Amino acid sequence: MKRAVTLKENYEFRRMYQRGASAVGGGMVVYCRKNKLGHNRLGITVSVKLGHAVVHNRARRRLREVYRLNSGRLRQGYDMILVARGRTLTASWKELNDTFLRLCRKLELLEDRS
């Protein structure tokens, strides 16, 4: 993912946690907030409680892939943070994908395809 489409700075994450809308589901938490850009930006966080670096990276890769597969269905102009939970590692791909779509629907991030 290009740097322009990722959230990297600490202040960006803090702002999202304080002022962004959130939805909690089985294996993840999604925070979102409208940005003034014409594209979405993504940040992914994994708690130290989940395990060591190999576990962190696996959870991060799974969330990044779920986002990539569904990015065409999302409205543009939002910053999003995906927070991995314990079930991120054990859930099936279908379950993880369904959870992501359900949380995005709850936050009204999915484009209306009428």
Protein language model regions, located:
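Positively charged, solvent-exposed patches that mediate nucleic-acid binding
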Residues: 1-114
